């Protein structure tokens, strides 16, 4: 079966056979003219292309010249939509080319305290800009040349924990229930968000860890940070108490803004009772500043700008003096108590802290646990350290049961009666 191309070729051959010599010469001249016209068009297009390349090269050199550092730093104040068709035309008025432009215009404020209206934005796509963005502008034309990273207080940047903590839940003894509650409230919403969505449950925003000193609150927070791939910000309550008015609130605001940018994120606020005490009437400006800092924290936890991808872990020894507004549901939803360890937990803690030590097999940790009534986790660690130091003093190669007993006596002698204040 013949193809369509073969049929066309046969048809053209038949036409050529039917044409006279003069007709063939005339057709060939027409083809030569068409070829010459196409070559001239191609030559003209190549010349135009070379001209455009030259112009592009010149413009790129001008842009490179204008983009030379240093930039003038500015903030986007407002982004406006320009539509010149809506404006009434005035007869006899000069034509302003900028006013005829369609699209987005920008109002920005520079670091020299000037407010500038830009009908032409510059080298940045205006769709990628929003009010409050930090931009670099040309110091003469004020055209936006580049977007700059958000500005944060240097103290807030120092709060970010760069090195991932090495602690694990296996390093914490006797707190299985507390570990489970913390995992449910903080870790699961970050690692298995779909399980909460399937049940229609909104996970807690924050967790309060409270209990006597040395019971493992900070250790638990470090283990939680190690188990998730989230950014970890560590704040201390006294850090947020600043001398100047509004400085502490700005630190809280910047910390949550940095957390939002690096979400998912865990913010750990240690010793929250430094800023979270109950509000009272006071004429002292320092007390009012502490209360303002706490109000900013309340707003960030449960305000219009709150973010579910940011979790807060707060720790304190004095939960009884915290403000009720901080403790209510929707802010620090889950309260986890860290009591003094039980006898079984004390034995487990002693085993954890002595597992890297060369311990004599005859050491009875259950008996040691019965001898350490009312000891907290930190004191049990001190017992292991003291036992190791006593063995070192004897030039021994392993730590014996007697060393642990002597360590308990030394730590018990250093115990302060004032610790009962936290119980």
Swiss-Prot record:
The keyword Ribosomal protein does not apply. The 26S proteasome is involved in the ATP-dependent degradation of ubiquitinated proteins. The regulatory (or ATPase) complex confers ATP dependency and substrate specificity to the 26S complex. Keywords: ATP-binding, Cytoplasm, Nucleotide-binding, Nucleus, Proteasome. It is found in: Cytoplasm; Nucleus. One of its GO terms (biological process) is proteasome-mediated ubiquitin-dependent protein catabolic process. This is 26S proteasome regulatory subunit 6A homolog. It comes from the Eukaryota. Disulfide bonds: none annotated. ATP binds at residues 211-218. Transmembrane segments: none annotated. Belongs to the AAA ATPase family. It holds the Pfam family AAA_lid_3. Its main location: cytoplasm. GO terms for cellular component: cytoplasm; nucleus; proteasome regulatory particle, base subcomplex. One of its GO terms (molecular function) is ATP binding. InterPro entries: 26S_Proteasome_ATPase, AAA+_ATPase, AAA_lid_3, ATPase_AAA_core, ATPase_AAA_CS, NA-bd_OB-fold, P-loop_NTPase, Prot_ATP_ID_OB_2nd. The lineage of its organism: Eukaryota, Viridiplantae, Streptophyta, Embryophyta, Tracheophyta. The keyword NAD does not apply.
């Amino acid at each position: 079966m013949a193809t369509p191309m073969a049929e066309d070729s046969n048809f053209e051959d038949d036409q050529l056979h039917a044409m006279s010599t003069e007709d063939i010469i005339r057709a060939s001249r027409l083809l030569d003219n068409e070829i010459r016209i196409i070559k001239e068009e191609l030559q003209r297009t190549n010349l135009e292309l070379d001209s455009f390349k030259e112009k592009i090269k010149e413009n790129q050199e001008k842009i490179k010249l204008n983009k030379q550092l240093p930039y003038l730093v500015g903030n986007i104040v407002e982004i406006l939509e320009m539509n010149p068709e809506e404006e009434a035309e005035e007869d006899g008025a000069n034509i302003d080319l900028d006013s005829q432009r369609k699209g987005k215009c920008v109002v920005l404020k520079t670091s020299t305290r000037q407010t500038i209206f830009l009908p032409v934005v510059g080298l940045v796509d205006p769709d990628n800009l929003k009010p409050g963005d930090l931009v670099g502008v040309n110091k003469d034309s004020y055209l936006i040349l580049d977007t700059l990273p958000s500005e944060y207080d240097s103290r807030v940047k120092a709060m970010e924990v760069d090195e991932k903590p090495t602690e694990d839940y296996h390093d914490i003894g006797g707190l299985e229930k507390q570990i489970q509650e913390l995992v449910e409230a903080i870790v699961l919403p970050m690692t298995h968000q779909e399980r909460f969505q399937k049940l229609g449950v909104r996970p807690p925003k924050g967790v309060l860890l409270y209990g006597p000193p040395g019971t493992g609150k900070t250790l638990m927070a470090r283990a939680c940070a190690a188990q998730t791939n989230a950014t970890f910000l560590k704040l201390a309550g006294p850090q947020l108490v600043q001398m100047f008015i509004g400085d502490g609130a700005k630190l809280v605001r910047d910390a949550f803004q940095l957390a939002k940018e690096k979400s998912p994120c865990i913010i750990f606020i240690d010793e929250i009772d430094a800023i979270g005490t109950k509000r009272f009437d006071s004429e002292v400006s320092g007390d009012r500043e502490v209360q303002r800092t706490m109000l900013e924290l309340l707003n960030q936890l449960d305000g219009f700008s709150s973010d579910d991808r940011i979790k807060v872990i707060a720790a304190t020894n004095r939960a009884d003096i915290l403000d009720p507004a901080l403790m209510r549901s929707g802010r620090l939803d889950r309260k986890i108590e860290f009591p003094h360890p039980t006898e079984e937990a004390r034995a487990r803690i002693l085993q954890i802290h002595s597992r890297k030590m060369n311990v004599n097999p005859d050491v009875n940790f259950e008996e040691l646990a019965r001898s350490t009534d009312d000891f907290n986790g930190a004191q049990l660690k001190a017992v292991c350290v003291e036992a190791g130091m006593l063995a070192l003093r004897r030039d021994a190669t392993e730590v014996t049961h007697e060393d642990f007993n002597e360590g308990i006596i030394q730590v018990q002698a250093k115990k302060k009666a004032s610790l009962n204040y936290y119980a």
